[in-house]
Amino acid sequence: MSEITLGRYVFERIKQVGVNTIFGLPGDFNLSLLDKIYEVEGLRWAASLNELNAAYAADGYSRIKGLGVIITTFGVGELSALNGIAGAYAEHVGVLHIVGVPSLASQAKQLLLHHTLGNGDFDVFHRMSANISETTAMITDLAAAPAEIDRCIRTAYIAQRPVYLGLPANLVDLNVPAKLLETKIDLALKANDAEAENEVVETILALVADAKNPVILSDACASRHNVKAEVKQLIDATQFPAFVTPLGKGSIDEKHPRFGGVYVGTLSSPEVKQSVESADLILSVGALLSDFNTGSFSYSYQTKNIVEFHSDYIKIKNASFPGVQMKFVLEKLIAKVGAKIANYSPVPVPAGLPKNAPVADSTPLAQEWLWNELGEFLEEGDIVVTETGTSAFGINQTRFPTDAYGISQVLWGSIGYSVGAMVGATFAAEELDKAKRVILFVGDGSLQLTVQEIACLIRWGLKPYIFVLNNNGYTIEKLIHGPTAQYNMIQNWKQLRYLTNFGATDYEAIPVKTVGEWKKLTADPAFKKNSTIRLIEVFLPEMDAPSSLVAQANLTAAINAKQD
C-alpha cells in the first residue's frame, strides 16, 4: 500500500502514540473522516452522548494515558465541547480536538451553510478555540497536511494542553504517502540549554546544602508532565518530607514513609501546615496555585527559599529560567544531591489522620466518617474520580494506597465534569488492565448535568463503581451562599434506576444509609472486584460537608464579597 487517505493517516498516527479510544459525536462534516476509524485495527469509537461529555471523557482518558482525542463537527458540535476543552487547558491536559469542517470549495464561495453564523466567516469558531489551545491548525494544503497533523499530535502530548485540528470534509478522502507512517512522531523532550540547566542545578544544590528543614511539595503538573518517577527518586535520595496538594493527589505514593499529607494552606491539618510552613527550603514540583488548591491563596511559607519546577521553566526565589524543563533538572538533581545532604538528619513527618472511632452500625453515614473510612476500601492502582464539591474536598482526608491516582477538576471546577472524566478514565483503565478499578464519587446535583454518559459505559460493558452522594442538592453552593435559596435546590431523581433505564442488564444498584451497611458492603470480596457496573447511592445529611469544604466555602464567600 503506497498511499492512504488523509483521514486514515490521522487515525494511524493517533494509534501510534498509544490512543485506542476516540470520543465525540458524528456530524455531516466529519462523517467521511469517521469511516476511517474502522480501518485502523485497535481503534474504537466510544460514541459519546454529547460533545461536552466527550470533551470531559477525552480529558479523563488523557490523565491516564497521556493524550485524549475528541472529534466534533463544525460550529454546533465544536462549540458544545469548548467548556471541557477550556478545563483541559486550565489543568494542563493533553487533548487533540479534531473538527470536521466544510469543504474548501464551500468556504471559498462563502456559502450560507447550516451550522454557520450566516455571515460567510468560516474561521470564527477556529478563532474561538485558539484562545484555549496550545496551537491550532486548519488544514488547507494536502501536501503539508501530514506534517501539520504530526505537529498537532506532538504538541498536545508534550505541552499537555488542548490542540485544535480542523479537517475539511473534501480532504479526508484524498491520498497521502503511506511511507510517512514509518517515521514515528518524536515525543521526546528537546534537551535543555546545557549552560542554563547546569546553572539551575548548581543553584538548587547550593540551597539544598544549606537547608536544615527542606520539604518537597508535589502538585498537578508532576503527573501531567510525567515526572512522578523523578519525584519519587528525589524523595528516596533525600528523605525530605513530601507533601501533595489537592490537585497533586496520586503524584506521590501516599504509603511512602516520607509522605506527610495534603497541604492546602490554612485548610491543612495543623501538623501538615506546621511542617510545610516552617520549612527553610521548599522544592515545589508542578505547582498550579489556584484558589481551591491553596485554601484561597492562604499559603504562608516562612522562607523565601522556594524552587518551582515547571514543564517549561524553573523559578528559584525571584529568578526565572525560561525554557529549562523540570524533567532533566530533576534527573541531574537526583544524581548529584547525595553529596550535598551528608549531614541532613531526616525530621519526622506528620502521622496520617486518625482512624474513625468505633460507632454503632446503625449510625447514619456522615461526610467526615466516610472520607476517613474510604482508604480501607481502596486498593493499589485504583483510579479515584471526585466531583467538584464535597467529594473533591473530602478525598483530601483519604490516604491513598500505592499507585492510586486521583482525578478532580480543582482549578476549572465545572460541575458534572467527573462523570465524563470517569468514562474516559474507565476506557483507559480497561486498555491498561481489565482488573484496574475506577471509582467515582459524585453528588446528586452534579450527576444530573452529565448522567446520560453512563449509557456509554453500558454500551461497552465497562465496570466502574459510581458512588452517588445524595445530600439533596448543591451543598457546596449552599455553603458559599444561599443555603435555602430555591436556585440551589434540585428535583430528586430515582438514582437506583439509572442503570436499568440506560439499558443495563448486568449491574448492581445498592442504597447505603448507615455505617454498618457501608462496612458490610465494602468488606465483601465480591464487591471489591470490578465484575459488573455498580451504582451505590450514599445517603448523607443535606448540609453535611467535610470540614475543609466548610472552611473553603467561608473563604470563597469572603473573597466574592470583597470590594477591592
Swiss-Prot record:
Amino acids binding Mg(2+): D444, N471, G473
Magnesium as UniProt keyword: yes
Keyword Hydrolase: no
Principal EC category: lyase
The organism of origin for this protein: Hanseniaspora uvarum (Yeast)
GO BP field: aromatic amino acid family catabolic process to alcohol via Ehrlich pathway
Designated name of the protein: Pyruvate decarboxylase
Entry GO CC: cytosol; nucleus
Family matches, as Pfam families: TPP_enzyme_C, TPP_enzyme_M, TPP_enzyme_N
Complex formation: Homotetramer.
Cofactor(s) demanded: Mg(2+); thiamine diphosphate
GO molecular function: magnesium ion binding; pyruvate decarboxylase activity; thiamine pyrophosphate binding
Cofactor, free-text remark: Binds 1 Mg(2+) per subunit.
